């Protein structure tokens, strides 16, 4: 590795397992989550499983608050004081949270806190949620630490982010009803009939791709949709995500191995930011599809 000091930073929506964050030296800053009049800092005040149980018991809708400008300024200043020369900061989709824009402003305000600082901030909008950007940040950190050029690793990461897709299934519509994403009537009828939506989440935009009846039909429908998005699933990198049900997780992993011909890169648990909208009962497949958008490569700040 070169003598240039590099640090890696992201937010808790990335859902990076703590063991991977520790392994690759990635700092993960928690989102603020409000539920039943109380504020919790994700990754510090509760575990994912505790949050899921709180959602089930609550009649209110959990809300999330963006990481603020002042929080980012304080964090950036600590990196400057530590002698960091390049800070790689990968953020939650800018279209779904003000966290990215707050970080942009913080990079400007940093000059007031640390006049004349020389740290380059590589601030990147992931255009997605959860481990799709968490995984690629881990890969970027791993390669940089192994001595690969930072600029090349950053370009590769952004290229892959333009290909990554999420296929999500919710086993209950209760949380979507609470959050207003579906009407109360539709949620009641849907749950009574056992309707399970298969949802794509690409570039921050969610879309119902299919509706199936019954839990047993969920994994096959997800796999079918994923197959429609790629040319060769045998060469497709993918991950499996879950909320609280290990049984549904294991069922999906088993089917993916059979249909895709290889095991997932990682099986991970979804955190509070995503599940605050989808509910505590869901599974997902994260995979590399075809390029969907041109990449506007980030320019270091300031």
Predicted regions, residues:
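Generic alpha-helical hydrophobic packing signal
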Residues: 7, 73, 77, 117-119
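Short N-terminal secondary-structure initiator segments
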Residues: 57-72, 84, 135-153
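Glycine/charged-rich beta-loop-alpha catalytic/anionic-binding loops adjacent to active sites
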Residues: 57, 84-89, 113-124, 267
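N-terminal glycine-rich phosphate/adenylate-binding segment common to multiple enzyme folds
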Residues: 69-103, 107-110
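N-terminal glycine-rich anion-binding loop in soluble enzyme alpha/beta folds
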Residues: 6-73
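Mixed-charge interfacial surface used for oligomerization/domain docking
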Residues: 2-7, 13-27, 32, 95-108, ...
